[in-house]
From Swiss-Prot:
Organism: Arabidopsis thaliana (Mouse-ear cress)
Name of this chain's protein: DNA-directed RNA polymerase 2, chloroplastic/mitochondrial
Originating gene: RPOT2
Region called Disordered, residue ranges: 307-326
InterPro entries assigned to the protein according to its UniProt record, in alphabetical order: DNA-dir_RNA_pol_helix_hairp_sf, DNA-dir_Rpol_C_phage-type, DNA-dir_Rpol_phage-type, DNA/RNA_pol_sf, RNA_POL_N_sf, RPOL_N
Main EC class the enzyme belongs to: transferase
Segments passing through the bilayer: none
Length: 1011
């Protein structure tokens, strides 16, 4: 080739591609004199331009890139191999000339190059190959595949680079954390199995078993026999000797991994959902089956990815083999279809498709078989000091037995349970640190939500909503346009992007208390209550009392056992995460749109212990305002009435206890332990430590604070009702209107109840029998007596519910004699309390009744109540009659529940008012979260409690008030009624209840609305 014929892209020819200039010499293949491909390529280019330009909305400048000319890349004088167009130009030997075109125009051109135009172009190429030159088809296919792969790789690289920039990480650090996160999600079971294999080897060679912790020795003892039993099942299936429908599912994972999953899942279920050391077979089987399904799905995905990478490197040899296998399978299926053997076809398809969710029957059968094998192979031996003779006391670790259901609905029905040996049960309390927990806090920011099952964890199954099998809700969510759900996606992403870390100083104190036996700072006692000895008597009364005491002691011990297991799991997560600089909590939501962190054990939605050991990973300078809010926050956590003072009163409380605060920080367990008197002791301790550090600094305002400061709603459900009804009286009671100090709605109701009872007490008992009860209750009425009833009034609490709540409070006080007297007093007090609530919150009660009437009308037509939240989330109430399906498993016949088409009218009616209000408080939190992100304010939230750094509390307070006013400036009730009328045009709905004249903007100036 002469210099005069220098091909395109060399220096003297760059004018043809005026958007790009060369940086490196491109790869150009040698001319092939016998090739007949050049006319075909020229044809393709012309057709691509003429047929695709309009459809793809390509600018004229971009179309110039592909003009066929004597100097074109399709010149007859050379064969040009395309540069990879799937990545940005600057990454493939070209750079942009920003002066040539406007930024917007070039972005369109670049987009065309990186996918849109290429797809239109190559689709035409494929058509042309079919009609003119079949020999070129592999080259076109190769081009297509390479472009697709490169685009996908570049998209992933771009996303990861954005994440690194967004979260302030260097590339190497981010990649290391990413790899660790992938391992946590995909290799935990494999790692545990490898550890057991290694321990078995060490035990055989060095006899290390006695040195293992008790729980780990149990797992190790069960691992090998269970693994061998599973391997035997797998071998029978491979030899064609097993006809069980679950067999091919068990053959998709190694036996050692299945063994580990089965052991840990059953033990985990006993820890979290067990009742006195036993779990229902149906629940345990579905839990184990679900875990196996998820692991198969992850492994299948990773295997496909690995094979794809290997095929790319090996030139597709393995891919050809795979194609042959697929072709063979297709022929076999077609033959069976012709013979009408559809059941055989179904089994083949099920056994070769592991991406689709399993049906409930399969999960139950797989889980039941694995539990059956564990029950058969797992044994336990009593410690030597507990054996009566020289023979070892070896017995099954688990027993499959049956219990009889109690209660009016299922009385007399038997159900299967797996019951663990008392020694296993004792070990459960210490097994948290050895539990395999894939759903941990994430080391990298969660994937952004983009669909029902797209977001959060990198590999673990993640759903944006916990539907609990509610089909209509799931379908409504999947069918909603993505644009409609974008505000919800953004809010959940915002909550998931908050960085957390473990407060090591608080965790150290927690560990010291726990290792010393607990029973401090609301931690459960690690010891059991001793069972009373049987009295040496035949007196029936004494024996009856003894039996009652034994039953009570066992109940207490059972509750303590559950609490100890729960605490152990929380501390296990805290210990695993304590050395991480930062971690993240991916969030999803319930069907009403309330957000929840997905990791189940240690999260900020949990107890005081959880909140005390968690803090923001990012520290921000306190500033003068932040120091003030930190002091107020400490008073709020101390509570005991202090939290009902004005903000200045709370500030004074903290400043009057500085010596106690310093002592708590310096000597939390050796000093006066003032922090233990707080209502939330561990959170109080965390603030004591932070405040001490700040006040001892020469410049307290510059000290970095990691403590989340809470701003809590005042009986938030009633706040939403007051805003809906524009109810001035109700608004004053729940702090929508400004006051000198916070209004206490519970004290307000208690005062009204006391006024009514005083009037009743003055009446003649012969005319009004309740007068005697009123007189006896006068000294019992306080905010605690009525608090639960007021709180649950927003949930539509009934008279019976209120009566039972007040009855429990009265029994705690022991001022009443027999059960009959307590019951009568509770009946009277419940009526008076509900009357006082009706009087104070007339608008709220009217709206509640309207909600109930509308729901009843809809449900009476056997329709579910559904609505769309202000953020665009479709909500469908899931209350349907449950049907049962009997599934025969290898262990027993299980009764699986499933949703029927018949709605539960009463449940649809009673649940609608609280569910609708919860959907509104969820919307308020999400709106606040997104606004905080845009304002640069760190945000975390727990329903009606909003958290941020001390320095940003003032900003948060402005934002949350503005968003509340914005939310209720919408015609929410009008929109709801309109949606009902559009969905059910044949039904008549009652008119909207009358509303008051409250100006919602007063919320903007109310200091105690959230405080």
């Amino acid at each position: 080739m002469s210099s005069a014929q220098t091909p395109l892209f060399l220096a003297n020819q760059t004018k043809v591609f005026d958007h790009l200039i060369p940086l490196h010499k491109p790869f150009i293949s040698s001319p092939n004199p016998v090739s007949q491909s050049f006319p075909m390529w020229r044809n393709i280019a012309k057709q691509a331009i003429s047929r695709s330009a309009a459809r793809l909305n390509v600018s004229s400048q971009t179309r110039g890139l592909l003009v066929s000319s004597p100097e074109s890349i399709f010149s007859k004088n050379l064969s040009f191999r395309f540069p990879v167009l799937g990545s940005p130009c600057h990454g493939k030997g070209f750079r942009c000339l920003s002066g040539i075109t406007r930024r917007e125009e070039f972005s369109k051109s670049e987009r065309c190059l990186s996918g849109t135009l290429a797809r239109g172009y190559t689709s035409v190429a494929e058509e042309e190959v079919l009609s003119t030159d079949v020999e070129e088809e592999p080259e076109v296919d190769e081009l297509l595949k390479e472009m697709k792969k490169e685009k996908k790789r570049e998209s992933h690289r771009s996303w990861r680079m954005k994440k690194q920039d967004q979260f302030g990480m260097g590339r190497t650090k981010f990649q290391n954390l990413w790899r660790r996160q992938v391992k946590i999600e995909t290799e935990e079971w494999e790692r545990a199995a490898a550890e057991y294999m290694e321990l078995l080897t060490d035990m055989c060679e060095q006899k290390l078993a006695p040195n293992l912790p008790y729980v780990k020795s149990l797992f190790l003892g069960w691992f090998e026999p269970l693994r061998d039993a599973i391997a035997k099942d797998q071998e029978l299936y491979r030899l064609g000797k097993s006809k069980a429908t679950y067999a091919h599912y068990l053959d998709q994972l190694p036996a050692d991994k299945i063994s580990v999953i089965t052991m840990h899942k059953l033990m985990g279920h006993l820890m979290t959902g067990g009742d006195n050391g036993c779990v229902k077979v149906v629940h345990a089987a579905c839990t184990v089956g679900d875990a196996i399904e998820q692991e198969i799905r992850i492994c299948t995905f990773l295997d496909k990815k690995k094979k794809g990478d290997d095929n790319e490197e090996s030139g597709g040899v393995e891919n050809e083999t795979s194609m042959k296998e697929q072709d063979k399978l297709r022929k076999k299926v077609n033959e069976l279809i012709k013979k009408q053997k559809l059941s055989a076809v179904r089994k083949i398809l099920q056994s070769h498709d592991y991406t689709k969710p399993w049906i409930a029957d399969v999960r139950a059968k797989v889980g039941s078989r694995l539990i059956e094998l564990l029950v058969r192979t797992a044994y336990i031996q009593s410690p030597a000091d507990q054996q009566d003779n020289d023979l070892p006391d070896v017995r099954p670790a688990f027993v499959h037995t049956f219990k009889v259901a109690k209660g009016s609905m299922n009385s007399g029905r038997k159900y299967g349970v797996i019951e663990c040996d008392p020694l296993v049960r004792k070990g459960l309390e210490k097994s948290g640190r050895y539990a395999v927990m894939p759903y941990m806090p994430m080391l990298v920011p969660p994937l952004k939500w983009s669909g029902y099952d797209k977001g959060a964890y990198l590999f673990l199954t993640s759903y944006i909503m916990k539907t609990h099998g509610a089909k209509q809700q799931r379908e409504a969510l999947k069918s909603a346009p993505k644009g409609q759900l974008q505000p919800v996606f953004e809010a959940l992403d915002t909550l998931g992007s908050t960085k957390w870390r473990v407060n090591k100083r608080v965790l150290t104190v927690v560990d010291r208390i726990w290792s010393s036996g607990g029973c401090v700072a609301d931690m459960v006692d690690r010891s059991d209550v001793p069972l009373p000895e049987k009295p040496d008597t035949e007196d029936e009364g004494i024996l009856k009392k003894w039996k009652w005491e034994v039953k009570s002691a066992k109940k207490v011990n059972s509750e303590r056992h559950s609490q100890r297991c729960d605490t152990e799991l929380k501390l296990s997560v805290a210990r695993k995460m304590k050395d991480e600089e930062a971690f993240y909590y991916p969030h999803n939501m319930d069907f009403r749109g309330r957000a929840y962190p997905m990791p189940p054990h240690l999260n900020h939605l949990g107890s005081d212990l959880c909140r005390g050991v968690l803090e923001f990973a990012e520290g921000r300078p306190m500033g003068i305002s932040g120091l003030r809010w930190l002091k107020i926050h400490l008073a709020n956590l101390y509570a005991g009435g202090v939290d009902k003072l004005s903000l200045d009163g709370r500030l004074a409380f903290t400043e009057n206890h500085l010596d106690d605060i310093f002592d708590s920080a310096d000597r939390p367990l050796e000093g006066s332990r003032w922090w233990l008197q707080a209502e939330d002791p561990f959170q109080c301790l965390a603030v004591c430590i932070s405040l001490t550090e700040a006040l001892r600094s020469p410049s307290p305002e510059t000290v970095l604070s990691h403590i989340p400061i809470h701003q809590d709603g005042s009986c938030n459900g009633l706040q939403h009702y007051a805003a809906l009804g524009r109810d001035t009286l109700g608004a004053e009671a729940v702090n929508l209107v400004a006051g000198e100090k916070p209004a206490d709605v519970y004290s307000g109701i208690a005062t009204r109840v006391l006024d009514i009872m005083r009037r009743d007490a003055d009446r003649d008992p012969e005319v009004f029998p309740e007068a005697l009860r009123a007189r006896k209750l006068l000294n019992q009425v306080d905010r605690k007596l009525v608090k639960q009833t007021v709180m649950t009034s927003v949930y539509g609490v009934t008279y019976i519910g209120a009566r039972d709540q007040i009855k429990r409070r009265l029994k705690e006080r022991s001022d009443f004699g027999d059960e009959k007297e307590v019951f009568g007093a509770a009946c009277y007090a419940a009526k008076v309390t509900l009357a006082a609530i009706d009087e104070m919150f007339q608008a709220a009660r009217a709206i509640m009744r309207w909600f109930g009437e509308c729901a009843k009308i809809i449900a009476s037509e056997n329709e579910t109540v559904r609505w769309t939240t202000p953020l665009g989330l479709p909500v469908v109430q899931p209350y349907h009659q449950m049907g049962t399906k009997l599934v025969k498993t290898s262990l027993q016949t299980l009764s699986l529940q499933h949703e029927t088409d018949q709605v539960i009218v009463r449940r649809q009616r009673t649940a609608f008012p609280p569910n609708f209000i919860h959907s509104l408080d969820g919307s308020h939190m999400m709106m606040t979260a997104v606004a905080c992100k845009r304002a640069g304010v760190c945000f975390a939230g727990v329903h009606d409690s909003f958290w941020t750094h001390a320095c940003d509390v003032d900003k948060l307070n402005i934002i949350l008030r503005e968003k509340f006013v914005e939310l209720y400036s919408q015609p929410i009730l009008e929109n709801l009624l309109e949606s009902f009328e559009q969905s059910f045009p044949h039904l008549d709905f009652p008119p909207l209840p009358e509303r008051g004249d409250l100006d919602l903007k007063v919320v903007l100036d109310s200091p105690y609305f959230f405080n």
